[in-house]
Amino acid sequence: MIASFEAPLATGFRVNTMLRDEDETIADLRAEGVPLEPVEGLPGAYSVPPDGRAALLASRPYADGHVYVQNVSSQLAPIALAPRKGDRVLDLCAAPGSKTGQLSALVGPEGEVTAVEKVRPRFYKLKANVYAQGATNVLPWMGNGAAYWRREPEAFDRVLVDAPCSTEGRFRTHDPETTAYWSGRKIREMKSKQVKLLWAGIQSLKPGGTLVYSTCTFAPEENESVVAKALRTFGDAIEVIDAGLPTSGPIADRAMAGLTEWRDRPLDPALERTRRVLPDELLEGFFIARLLKNSSTVGVGGGGMA
């Protein structure tokens, strides 16, 4: 895994099907000589090698907004969430809007995505991004994601909590900025936010609905530990289900089961169904947990997870 920090990273992208047909866009890219390859097991995902990035960014489909550059790992969470056409989806940590746009395309014009961001500059970046993608079914909301559940408790079919994190999965040795802000204190700070966001996400989810919790870090404190706390808080009202990732291809090859023990302490065995995606030339490091809500959680947890 350490060697992956030194490897040049392929450029992942998806076709913006809200603006143009996927097959037509891919045909145009190939005609312009863009050396793209589909990502096996992940519908709509493509990649170009490092030396093909310039050709992709110089292409007409990219200039027209028909191509959206997004690392393949970043595309996993919306795919795992698997929203249906017409679903109401809550994207609780939405900026800059990459996954928001992807979710918008998945639910279709009959669906709706509420996109939450509390930092003002990031909120306006989110709005501009989803507008550029043609995502007319997105409702941006500026405010604290940890408090949004009070506006619409148990109102959403699907909830994505792509939580802020210490970004260990994006470390690259040739780019000092990727490690500049990392510290043990940062991990503790992020965990505190993540616990509140996951609790709020669960409270926003309808009984019978699905929630995906994801990060781009390796720290168990920010991944399995956060999900374990939710399992202790909500008991049988929620359960960890299969992560919903591809079962073949490069993603399956790099996905490992979540930890069920950390620092000689056992964790909930159900965490084995979460997935850690290890980085390589195609993928950034990523963690995904998919939760099913079995029953109402109104009044559970006393306003947070202790």
Enumerate the language-model features and the residues they cover:
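S-adenosylmethionine
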Residues: 1-306
